[in-house]
Amino acid sequence: MTHTLRVIFAGTPEFAAAALAAIHEAGFPVPLVLTQPDRPAGRGMKLQASAVKRYAVEHGIPVAQPPSLRRAGKYPGEAADAIELLRTTPHDVMVVAAYGLLLPQEVLDIPRAGCINIHASLLPRWRGAAPIHRAIEAGDAETGVTLMQMDVGLDTGAMIEEARVAIAPDDTTATLHDRLAADGARLIVDALVRLERDGALPATPQPADGVTYAEKIGKHEAALDWRKPADVLARQVRAFDPFPGGVATLDGAAIKLWAAEPVAARGDAVPGTIVDAAPEGVIVACGSGALRVTQLQKPGGKRLPAREFLAGSPLAAGQRFALPDGA
């Protein structure tokens, strides 16, 4: 089906690329894509295009990569050029998903139908940069995707529609991300169809109660504090897959833990102490309960099931993982 509603798209990672693909494949004209500049990544730290840019280039969609859209920011010239490009590119609405750049009021005012954001949480809970990670880390039973009409606040715009998603006990950020990306793609296509048909989308202001913020994940958060309860640490491991991973330091080596589950405590071992190292999992004492770690990765190695990890890097009861620096 061919549509007439013209959509400028702004986004960067895979979550956004899923939405761009759905919009494009649904037949909406996409005259321009905005995405962040190429960044160094991987072992060789070579410049890598974003997932959104890769899709746009593959499908012949024009791409712009301004480092900023704020005239008063660090890149005023580039911002001015990008804003002029937006003004001179005929379009009706802008869709924004995990773009990573702030949109000033000047930009929000350019599209006739405004800017619609796809946010990976049930707003107003988990506004901010890392809503999927924080929902798992906090032990939320459900999360979802919200479409909102953007304003200059941080994810404060009026809500157009939402989809709810249960968080499974074994969900990681990676697995939950994929389901939310699919839901976001479906929601935005449905919303654009209605916008084209009706000329506007009803939106409801966010409630004042229940606001929380999902701060960006930092590498410093990766270190496991074994004094915490086992269920808290298990959620941390799941929340930090694929980035930055849960990290446990043993004899100066940072071992990444990728899968773990809380189990009953065994004895009264000091938190961080390995109480059993079996093929089924490495059991580590925690502040309350214990953690069975079933997937590990040594420095420079690959993720391995506990059985394979122990075959090449034996661990033994009585060894103790260090507490985080400053603990």
From Swiss-Prot:
One of its GO terms (molecular function) is methionyl-tRNA formyltransferase activity. Gene3D superfamilies: Formyl transferase, C-terminal domain, Formyl transferase, N-terminal domain. InterPro entries: Fmt, Formyl_trans_C, Formyl_trans_C_sf, Formyl_transf_N, Formyl_transf_N_sf, Formyl_transferase-like_C_sf, GART_AS, Met-tRNA-FMT_C. Its EC number is 2.1.2.9. (6S)-5,6,7,8-tetrahydrofolate binds at S121, L122, L123, P124. It comes from the Bacteria. SUPFAM superfamilies: FMT C-terminal domain-like (SSF50486), Formyltransferase (SSF53328). The keyword Ligase does not apply. It catalyses: L-methionyl-tRNA(fMet) + (6R)-10-formyltetrahydrofolate = N-formyl-L-methionyl-tRNA(fMet) + (6S)-5,6,7,8-tetrahydrofolate + H(+). It holds the Pfam family Formyl_trans_C. Keywords: Protein biosynthesis, Transferase. PROSITE patterns: GART. One of its GO terms (cellular component) is cytosol. The keyword Protein biosynthesis applies. Attaches a formyl group to the free amino group of methionyl-tRNA(fMet). The formyl group appears to play a dual role in the initiator identity of N-formylmethionyl-tRNA by promoting its recognition by IF2 and preventing the misappropriation of this tRNA by the elongation apparatus. Belongs to the Fmt family. This is Methionyl-tRNA formyltransferase. It comes from Burkholderia ambifaria (strain MC40-6).
